[in-house]
């Protein structure tokens, strides 16, 4: 099985019940942190520009654009919210992993909102995305060494 297939299998096989409780508690903190940072960042110029692009798109109102008072397509909401989450550079970081939460949470929330996902499903998706990010970065670091 190649690396891509292994990652896909891991994503498909991961269920909320299999995620350690410590990881879930840490994920809850990270989600709250990211949403707070995105709300603050939504007032920054770059985030406002991305939000305006999302507003101009003639799209279904699938997901909230944080701090802007409107909804857009899941794609545009994820883009605008991801920009807002990074805008003030307050997102947490890890030496090897960079800043995985700010790109993951906006995508997970936008898609989750558009599909009617539960809180458990949001946490499952976030922790799975975080784990995949960490493992792929570790793999890449070993390949470069």
PLM features per residue range, with description:
Residues 1-145:
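N-terminal core-entry segment
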């Amino acid at each position: 099985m190649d690396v891509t297939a292994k990652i896909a299998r891991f994503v498909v096989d991961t269920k909320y019940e299999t995620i350690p409780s410590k990881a879930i508690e840490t994920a809850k903190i990270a989600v709250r942190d990211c949403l707070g940072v995105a709300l603050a960042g939504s007032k920054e110029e770059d985030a406002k520009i991305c939000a305006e692009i999302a507003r101009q798109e003639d799209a279904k109102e699938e997901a909230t654009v944080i701090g802007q008072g409107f909804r857009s397509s899941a794609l545009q909401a994820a883009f605008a919210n991801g920009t807002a989450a990074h805008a003030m550079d307050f997102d947490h970081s890890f030496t090897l992993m960079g800043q995985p939460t700010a790109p993951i949470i906006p995508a997970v929330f936008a898609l989750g909102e558009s599909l009617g996902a539960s809180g458990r499903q949001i946490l499952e998706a976030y922790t799975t995305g975080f784990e995949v990010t960490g493992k792929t970065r570790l793999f890449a670091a070993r390949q470069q060494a």
